Amino acid sequence: MVLTIYAPLFASSKRAVVTLVEKGVSFETVNVDLMKGEQRQPEYLAIQPFGKIPVLVDGDYKIFESRAIMRYIAEKYRSQGPDLLGKTIEERGQVEQWLDVEATSYHPPLLALTLNIVFAPLMGFPADEKVIKESEEKLAEVLDVYEAQLSKNEYLAGDFVSLADLAHLPFTEYLVGPIGKAHLIKDRKHVSAWWDKISSRAAWKEVSAKYSLPV
């Protein structure tokens, strides 16, 4: 049974997509047009009752939330491709810790920047300059912590690439691209080296080329 991932073009979904590609798992995609409200249609709500993206369908099994999907893929296909979860319980703890940091500390200010700088103009809404300023300041503080961590380890959870690193790829691509604030990455030596490593991985290059930003 081939896995199916919904809405592969959007950043949140690409967390799941890059995990599938890293693991060498075959999958199909189904586009969901958020601008047309397809995520609120009954057939989509039947598999994602909150009307959000992404969703992974694996036969009769359905799972949503991008980081949960990443964990599911990494566990189910642990024996193939790179081990993205860590080899010991201590390494796994670090992977989980930095996945949570990405979700709770890194992603919120970056999402605010994405919405105000990239999507607000497309949707005809004024950007909130106060939110932009505050979000950039918050993200800079988070990245200072990353700089300290990455001065000790090659990757966030240790000296191995993991889900914690991959989870950062899609929205950081916005940060260094259409958001226009690459200096937040480049001005930090160790963060910059880390970003160069993870963004140059073959799996991410494939995902970026095949599933281009919807803006």
UniProtKB/Swiss-Prot annotation:
Induction comment: By dehydration stress, wounding, H(2)O(2) and jasmonate, but not by growth regulators.
Location(s), subcellular: Cytoplasm, Cytosol
Record domain GST C-terminal: where: 88-215
GO CC entries: apoplast; chloroplast; cytoplasm; cytosol; peroxisome; plant-type cell wall; plant-type vacuole; plasma membrane
Tissue expression summary: Expressed in roots, stems, floral buds, mature flowers and leaves.
InterPro entries for the chain: Glutathione-S-Trfase_C-like (IPR010987), Glutathione-S-Trfase_C_sf (IPR036282), Glutathione_S-Trfase (IPR040079), Glutathione_S-Trfase_N (IPR004045), GST_C (IPR004046), GST_Phi_C (IPR034347), Thioredoxin-like_sf (IPR036249)
GO molecular function annotation: copper ion binding; glutathione binding; glutathione transferase activity
Enzyme superclass (EC): transferase
Coiled coil feature spans: none
Keyword terms: Cytoplasm, Detoxification, Stress response, Transferase
EC number: 2.5.1.18
CDD domains xrefs: GST_C_Phi, GST_N_Phi
GO biological process: response to water deprivation; toxin catabolic process
One Pfam family linked to the record: GST_C
Effect of a null allele: No visible phenotype, maybe due to the possible redundancy with GSTF9.
Residue positions binding glutathione: 11-12, 39-40, 52-53, 65-66
Presence of keyword Transferase: yes
Function according to Swiss-Prot or TrEMBL: In vitro, possesses glutathione S-transferase activity toward 1-chloro-2,4-dinitrobenzene (CDNB) and benzyl isothiocyanate (BITC). May be involved in the conjugation of reduced glutathione to a wide number of exogenous and endogenous hydrophobic electrophiles and have a detoxification role against certain herbicides.
Protein family (similarity comment): Belongs to the GST superfamily. Phi family.
PANTHER family, A to Z: GLUTATHIONE S-TRANSFERASE F10 (PTHR43900:SF50), GLUTATHIONE S-TRANSFERASE RHO (PTHR43900)
Subunit and partners: Interacts with BAK1.
Protein's recorded name: Glutathione S-transferase F10
Originating organism: Arabidopsis thaliana (Mouse-ear cress)
UniProt gene name: GSTF10
